[in-house]
Amino acid sequence: MNIVPILLIRFYQSFISPLLGPSCKYHPTCSNYAIEAFRQHNFFYASWLTVWRVLRCNPFSKGGYDPVPPKSVKSAGNSKDSK
């Protein structure tokens, strides 16, 4: 798990976000989205997802429900039918 980025985001949620007020147009909020991304994906992909989400959270976006994409499931065996 990516504990350091999650702790930094929790710090932001506890001490900085209350001063700024609610402003995220998405559900889950951008900071909760980032925490989920770091829980589900590696550091680099989670960082990319977080940056892309924050860039999309702007006055010109509609917002709405935008969950973290799930980890892709790779097939464990041969996909051909054996006969």
Swiss-Prot record:
Q: Which GO terms describe its cellular component?
A: plasma membrane
Keyword Nucleotidyltransferase included in the entry's annotation: no
Recorded topology in the membrane: Peripheral membrane protein
Region Disordered: what ranges? Answer: 62-83
Q: Does the keyword Cell membrane apply?
A: yes
Report the Pfam families cross-referenced here: YidD
Subcellular compartments: Cell inner membrane
Print the keywords alphabetically. Cell inner membrane, Cell membrane, Membrane
The main location class comes to membrane
On the tree of life, the source organism's domain of life is: Bacteria
Q: What does this protein do?
A: Could be involved in insertion of integral membrane proteins into the membrane.
Q: Please report which protein family the annotation says this sequence is part of.
A: Belongs to the UPF0161 family.
UniProt name for this protein? Putative membrane protein insertion efficiency factor
Provenance organism? Chlorobaculum tepidum (strain ATCC 49652 / DSM 12025 / NBRC 103806 / TLS) (Chlorobium tepidum)
